[in-house]
Amino acid sequence: MRVMGVDPGLTRCGLSMVEGGHGRTVTALDVDVVRTPADMDLAHRLMLVADAAEYWMDTHRPGAVAIERVFAQHNVRTAMGTAQAGGVIALAAARRDIPVVFHTPSEVKAAVTGNGNADKAQVTAMVTRILGLQTAPKPADAADALALAICHCWRAPLLARMAAAEAKAAEAKRRYTERLAEQRKAVRG
């Protein structure tokens, strides 16, 4: 499974591409950080982020895009910019029929380090180790994008099994409800 990991941001947006193999084998294919000037207007900054993400999607052809879910930050303006960057990337993926999955920072940290409260240094160290890199990816946005892609490679099979189980349970409930309705009808009839 080829996964594009995205650590969204306006000033720095981490992009990564990994290939998931058998078991927990993951290989890094590419990683970069898109930078936009803080003094540029918002629409053009978003366009630069979207253009880079679209180029990556068209070049690498991922099977899924994993984006960090933004749910709270101390600075509302930063949170808005981060969410907007993630949104334009999700839109670019949707236009290409590429599934988009959002993972929380704690899910990513737990998947990569085993600790949902790990710090950036721990995440970077584990990403370096998991991917067998000679040097740690820098800046942190690059490491975070790789961590997101790794997280999705490892969580995707579990998420698929859970979705299948939920669908099976919904179908069983539907059949049960139909049988119950038929029995009630027979008793009344």
UniProtKB/Swiss-Prot annotation:
One of its GO terms (cellular component) is cytoplasm. Its main location: cytoplasm. It catalyses: Endonucleolytic cleavage at a junction such as a reciprocal single-stranded crossover between two homologous DNA duplexes (Holliday junction). Binds 2 Mg(2+) ion per subunit. Its EC number is 3.1.21.10. It is found in: Cytoplasm. Mg(2+) 1 binds at residues 7, 141. Pfam families: RuvC. The active site is at 7, 68, 141. Keywords: Cytoplasm, DNA damage, DNA recombination, DNA repair, DNA-binding, Endonuclease, Hydrolase, Magnesium, Metal-binding, Nuclease. One of its GO terms (biological process) is DNA recombination. One of its GO terms (molecular function) is magnesium ion binding. It is an enzyme of class 3 (hydrolase). Belongs to the RuvC family. NCBIfam families: ruvC. The RuvA-RuvB-RuvC complex processes Holliday junction (HJ) DNA during genetic recombination and DNA repair. Endonuclease that resolves HJ intermediates. Cleaves cruciform DNA by making single-stranded nicks across the HJ at symmetrical positions within the homologous arms, yielding a 5'-phosphate and a 3'-hydroxyl group; requires a central core of homology in the junction. The consensus cleavage sequence is 5'-(A/T)TT(C/G)-3'. Cleavage occurs on the 3'-side of the TT dinucleotide at the point of strand exchange. Homodimer which binds Holliday junction (HJ) DNA. The HJ becomes 2-fold symmetrical on binding to RuvC with unstacked arms; it has a different conformation from HJ DNA in complex with RuvA. In the full resolvosome a probable DNA-RuvA(4)-RuvB(12)-RuvC(2) complex forms which resolves the HJ. HAMAP family: RuvC (MF_00034). This is Crossover junction endodeoxyribonuclease RuvC.
